[in-house]
Design a protein with these regions (language model features):
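Short, extreme N-terminal leader segments that mark the start of a protein/domain
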Residues: 1-63
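Short, basic/low-complexity N-terminal boundary segments at the transition from targeting/disordered tails
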Residues: 24-28, 66-77, 148-154
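Short linear motifs in intrinsically disordered
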Residues: 36-41, 84-86, 160-164
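Residue-level signal for pocket-adjacent positions within structured domains
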Residues: 57, 67-68, 188, 199
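A contiguous, surface-oriented mixed alpha/beta subdomain in the mid-to-C-terminal portion of proteins
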Residues: 95-267
Length: 267
């Protein structure tokens, strides 16, 4: 989101939005936030990790192991994966927080190529200033997304309160011999999870938090596939290792969409 501004009839009386299947706007994003309700679909394709600190920890889907490169956006701008995260699908719209009134205000990224005043795509308002069905659908989607995101934050708070998260880094040997590491993320500590008392495990099972945790752990196998996809065609046998990272070592901050950082060192 480079230029997100509030949506209003005064500003957007002639605004249309054409989205289609072009995702070039996400080509430089190597991770995006997820909601817990997406774990089953996203976890079948992307590694799911956790990024942020304290109350700002959020679930995150890893989309690439190279900095500023999304391995799932193809050269023609289409999405090369089966499941497209809701964070990506909601673009170019986003809720902005208006602190003074404690409200969420719908914003649109005017830098997006699909935003226009030439009637390409869907209009936001009709000639009388009423919301179009398209804009109503956008609002409904974002309201649902926000509710799911808030529930996901509660799940992450549970993991933090139980001290189940540990900083990790993934190391890759890419075709050509270069070494890459992905840092700034956390995973659930399996041993601490197994050590939880039956009452706590029962509570997590009742709220589907335990299922989400297992889906997260199972999704980590996709790191090797992401590395292979990032290495281009012909990449074979990409070795992958995980190491515990010291707290404060490449740690993530905030709750942005780009918490997992990739670095590259040639050897």
């Amino acid at each position: 989101y480079e230029s997100a501004v509030p949506v209003s009839f005064k500003r957007d009386a002639k605004t249309s939005v054409k989205t289609g299947d072009a995702y070039a706007f996400a080509s430089k994003v190597n991770s995006v936030p997820l909601t817990a309700s997406e774990f089953a679909d996203a976890g079948a394709e992307y590694p799911i990790v956790f990024a942020g600190e304290g109350e700002n920890v959020i679930p995150t889907a890893i989309l690439g192991v190279a900095g500023e490169r999304n391995a799932f956006v193809t050269s023609d701008g289409t999405w090369g994966g089966r499941y497209i995260p809701a964070f990506v699908r909601r673009y170019p719209f986003v809720f902005g927080h208006q602190a003074a009134e404690n409200q969420l205000i719908l914003h649109i990224d005017e830098s997006f190529d699909g935003v226009n005043e030439n009637d390409r795509g869907e209009r936001l308002f009709d000639s009388e200033g009423n919301r179009t069905q398209y804009l109503q659908n956008v609002l409904a989607f974002l309201q649902d997304y926000q509710a799911r995101f808030n529930r996901s934050r509660a799940y992450c708070k549970r993991l933090v309160d139980l001290d189940l998260l540990r900083p990790m880094q993934a190391q890759f040997t890419m075709p050509g011999g270069e070494r890459r590491s992905l840092t700034g993320f956390m995973t659930v500590d399996r041993e601490k999870l197994k050590a939880l008392d039956p009452e706590t495990l029962g509570q997590m099972m009742a709220t589907d938090e335990l299922e989400c945790t297992f889906l997260h752990l199972a999704s980590l196998r996709h790191f090797a596939e992401i590395a292979e996809r990032s290495g281009g065609e012909g990449a074979e046998d990409t070795p992958l290792t995980f190491q515990s990272a010291k707290r404060g070592d490449g740690g993530a901050e905030g709750d942005s969409a780009e918490e997992a950082k990739a670095s590259e060192t040639a050897e």
